[in-house]
C-alpha cells in the first residue's frame, strides 16, 4: 500500500512498505508534487524492490524554490524534513541529482543520516554534465519547453548516431512542466555543487556506471576516496541512466543496508 503525505515545508512524499524508514530523494521532475502516471509507476516498481523490512519515503523538492537555489539549500530542506518527521537520523538514498542532494545532506547534517546510498552521482558534475544541464536550464528559463529535454541527450548517449536519433525523438516532446522554476532551482543547485566529502561520517555506498557522462569515472572514484567510510560499486559498460538495469544494482543496495 502506498501512502501520500506532506513533510515539513510542504515537501511531497510517498511511503512504500512497512518498517524502519529510508528516505529516497527524487531527481529533477517537472512537477513539485508527487509523481503521477508513468513516472509514479516507474518509481513504485523500482522502490518496491527495496522495501524489504523498511518503509521507503520518496520525497520531492520543497515547493517555491527559485533560480539561484544552492545545493546546501536543498540539503537543508531534506534534513529538516527528516528530523521533524522521524526525530532521529535515518538511511538516505538518492539517484542522479537526488544523489547529489543526498551527499550534501550527509556532509552538512550528519545528525540526519545513518547510512547513505548515492547512485549515478559524484561530488560535482563533469564537464559534459555541466554543459548539457546548463543548456537544459537555459531552455526552461526562456520558456522553450518543447523538446527542452533533448538538451540532456549528450549526457545519456555518447555515440553520434544514437545521440542524433534520440535527440530527434526527444524534440517531439510537447509537454509543459508544472513547476519550471523548481526544475531551474535544482539545476542551478547542481551546477554549483561541490560537496565537502571529507565531512560525510555515515557509511556510504556509491554506485555508478563507468560510462556515465554526467559524473565520469574519475570524479566518482575521487568521491569514494574522499569519503572516510565509502564502498564503491562501478558497473562496466553502464551509463548514467541504465546503471539501474545492472543485475547487481538492487542486490548491492540491499546487502549494504542489511549488513552495514
Task: State the predicted function of each range.
Residues 100-103, 107, 114-143:
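Flexible "cap/lid" loop of the alpha/beta hydrolase fold
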Residues 213-219:
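Conserved alpha/beta-hydrolase "acid-adjacent" motif
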Residues 5-65:
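Conserved HGGG/HGGXW glycine-rich cap/lid loop of the alpha/beta-hydrolase fold
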Residues 221-241:
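Catalytic histidine neighborhood in serine/cysteine hydrolases
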Residues 200, 206-208, 212:
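Short beta-strand/loop motif that positions the catalytic acidic residue
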Residues 73-90:
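Conserved acidic catalytic loop of the alpha/beta-hydrolase fold
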Residues 238-251:
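Catalytic histidine-centered segment of alpha/beta-hydrolase-like enzymes
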Amino acid at each position: 500500500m502506498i501512502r501520500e503525505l506532506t513533510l515539513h515545508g510542504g515537501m511531497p512524499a510517498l511511503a512504500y512498505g512497512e518498517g524502519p524508514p529510508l528516505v529516497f530523494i527524487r531527481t529533477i521532475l517537472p512537477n513539485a508534487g508527487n509523481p503521477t502516471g508513468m513516472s509514479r509507476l516507474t518509481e513504485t516498481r523500482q522502490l518496491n524492490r527495496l522495501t524489504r523490512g523498511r518503509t521507503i519515503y520518496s520525497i520531492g523538492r520543497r515547493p517555491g524554490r527559485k533560480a539561484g537555489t544552492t545545493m546546501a539549500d536543498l540539503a537543508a530542506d531534506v534534513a529538516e524534513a527528516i528530523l521533524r518527521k522521524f526525530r532521529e537520523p535515518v538511511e538516505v538514498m538518492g539517484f542522479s541529482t537526488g544523489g547529489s542532494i543526498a551527499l550534501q545532506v550527509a556532509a552538512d547534517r550528519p545528525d540526519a543520516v545513518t547510512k547513505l546510498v548515492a547512485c549515478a552521482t559524484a561530488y560535482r558534475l563533469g564537464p559534459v554534465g555541466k554543459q548539457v544541464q546548463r543548456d537544459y536550464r537555459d531552455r526552461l528559463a526562456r520558456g522553450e519547453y518543447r523538446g527542452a529535454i533533448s538538451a540532456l541527450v549528450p549526457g545519456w548517449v555518447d555515440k553520434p548516431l544514437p545521440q542524433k536519433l534520440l535527440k530527434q525523438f526527444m524534440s517531439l516532446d510537447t509537454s509543459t512542466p508544472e513547476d519550471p522554476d523548481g526544475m531551474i532551482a535544482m539545476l542551478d543547485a547542481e551546477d554549483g555543487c561541490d560537496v565537502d566529502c571529507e565531512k560525510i561520517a555515515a557509511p556510504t555506498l556509491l554506485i555508478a556506471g563507468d560510462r556515465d557522462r554526467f559524473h565520469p569515472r574519475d570524479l566518482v572514484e575521487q568521491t569514494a576516496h574522499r569519503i572516510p567510510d565509502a564502498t564503491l560499486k562501478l558497473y562496466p559498460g553502464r551509463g548514467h541512466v541504465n546503471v539501474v538495469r545492472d543485475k547487481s544494482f538492487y542486490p548491492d543496495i540491499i546487502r549494504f543496508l542489511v549488513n552495514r
